């Protein structure tokens, strides 16, 4: 039975304020400076100095500007580091706009296929509503980028540079989502009118033709081949003529992307450890690589990341940067904002409770480039972000180990460095992963909620 808030109750609450001695000072501080500034601790700057015992040199950072391409920038950063080192190309960047174009195009087809497949359900069905709420966004996953690279390859940034619409993607997303919603309703109508598969597919092709034209107009037409011309750090001139994006990846990166797998730490009741999971409606390339995550206990999760760093390879990872972060200082720490002291309230929650209640979810991908080990235990981590070089330590952030425990959810690891039991668990589960609901927090990096 519901009960309203009475004015007597409000009077009691008002009287209770006097029981909190720091209320007056806290109120002045919060109202003058805002909650976060008023509760900010300076100790994090002391504890998180950028010194590390295991560190990989990765050079200058990139800048995703006003777009949600963190997952793409971070993944391409792991690859460009390899190119920079092997071919002596300091400052080299891969084109994030190139993979952005093909991601938008493939996501459009992915959306239409899901709309056609769910056309028998009412628009009010939760899954259908989920599809139409955000037909596509800038977000994505490591496996989704692998699917794009396996199909389209990659190119240097100077071959397919940024545009106004890749650097600030709001108008592009608004335009594309309008086209997708309109087209999606048309496809649903055709299916429900009993039109043939051929007629439905013909209309989908017309819709994709219009979308391709819009993307080419907004971002430029991606190259089928190009000349890769550069001078290396030793002053030597090179030219690789008429190379395709697919061959560029094979020649200059050369990774077998199947050897890189996603592991997560999702300590919720619906995700048993050592099992592989996928997320419904999460993907981009129809018929391409499926998003798959192997769930591991935190201690194992962390141990494997440290081992990869020791082997000299950086680690792509997904986290929740909306919690405990100071963007200007470049710090990620659970103690940086002490709201419990400001409000005399216990804000603590378990990692599982945050995930289950919507308090936390993956919303940003970055790259781990270093760890500081004291007595063989991690104390802090160095993070390559993609927000430009004006924040943090020339664009790098320092993450406390406690923040890692609470807000790091995913990492991509090279199978070459994994123990046999972890490889076996992944290989046994990857063909028939447990499918999570579309709105699961382990899929949140790819969606706008």
UniProtKB/Swiss-Prot annotation:
Subcellular location: Cytoplasm
Domain of life, per lineage: Bacteria
A biological-process GO annotation: response to toxic substance
CDD domains to which the protein is assigned, alphabetical: Peptidase_C1B
Keyword presence, Transmembrane helix: no
Transmembrane region(s): none
Descriptive protein name: Aminopeptidase C
């Amino acid at each position: 039975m519901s009960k309203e808030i009475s004015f007597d109750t409000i009077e009691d609450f008002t009287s209770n304020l006097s029981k909190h001695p720091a209320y007056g000072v806290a109120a002045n501080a919060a109202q003058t400076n805002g909650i976060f500034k008023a509760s900010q601790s300076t100790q994090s700057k002391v504890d998180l100095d950028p010194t590390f015992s295991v560190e990989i040199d990765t050079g200058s950072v990139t800048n995703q500007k006003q777009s949600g391409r963190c997952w793409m920038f971070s993944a391409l950063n792991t690859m460009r580091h390899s190119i920079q080192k092997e071919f002596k190309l300091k400052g080299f960047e891969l084109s994030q706009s190139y993979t952005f174009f093909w991601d938008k195009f493939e996501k459009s087809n992915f959306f239409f296929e899901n709309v056609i497949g769910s056309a028998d359900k009412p628009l009010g069905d939760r899954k259908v509503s989920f599809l139409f709420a955000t037909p596509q966004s800038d977000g994505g996953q490591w496996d989704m980028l692998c699917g794009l690279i396996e199909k389209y390859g990659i190119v240097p940034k100077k071959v397919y540079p940024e545009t106004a619409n890749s650097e600030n993607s709001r108008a592009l997303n608004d335009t594309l989502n309008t086209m997708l919603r309109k087209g999606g309703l048309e496809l649903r109508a055709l299916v429900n009118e009993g039109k043939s598969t051929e007629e439905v597919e013909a209309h989908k092709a017309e819709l994709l033709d219009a979308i391709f034209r819009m993307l080419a107009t907004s971002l430029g037409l991606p190259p089928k081949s190009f000349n890769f011309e550069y001078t290396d750090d030793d002053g030597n001139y090179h030219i690789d003529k008429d190379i395709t994006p697919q061959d560029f990846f094979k020649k200059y990166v050369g990774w077998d992307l199947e050897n890189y797998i996603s592991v997560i730490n999702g300590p919720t009741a619906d995700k048993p450890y050592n099992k592989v999971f996928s997320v419904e409606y999460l993907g981009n390339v129809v018929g391409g690589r499926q998003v798959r995550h192997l769930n591991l206990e935190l201690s194992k999760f962390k141990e494997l990341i440290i081992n990869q760093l020791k082997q000299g390879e950086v680690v792509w990872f997904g986290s929740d940067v909306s919690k405990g972060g100071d963007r200007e200082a470049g710090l990620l720490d659970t103690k940086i904002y002490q709201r419990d002291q400001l409000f005399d309230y216990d804000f603590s929650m378990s990692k599982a409770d945050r995930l289950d209640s919507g308090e936390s979810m993956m919303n940003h991908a970055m790259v781990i480039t270093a760890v500081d080990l004291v007595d063989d235990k991690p104390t802090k981590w160095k993070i390559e972000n993609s927000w430009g070089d004006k924040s943090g330590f020339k664009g790098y952030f320092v993450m406390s180990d406690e923040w890692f425990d609470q807000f790091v959810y995913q990492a991509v690891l090279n199978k070459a460095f994994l123990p046999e039991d972890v490889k076996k668990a992944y290989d046994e589960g990857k063909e028939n992963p447990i499918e999570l609901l579309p709105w699961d927090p382990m899929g949140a990096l790819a969606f706008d909620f």
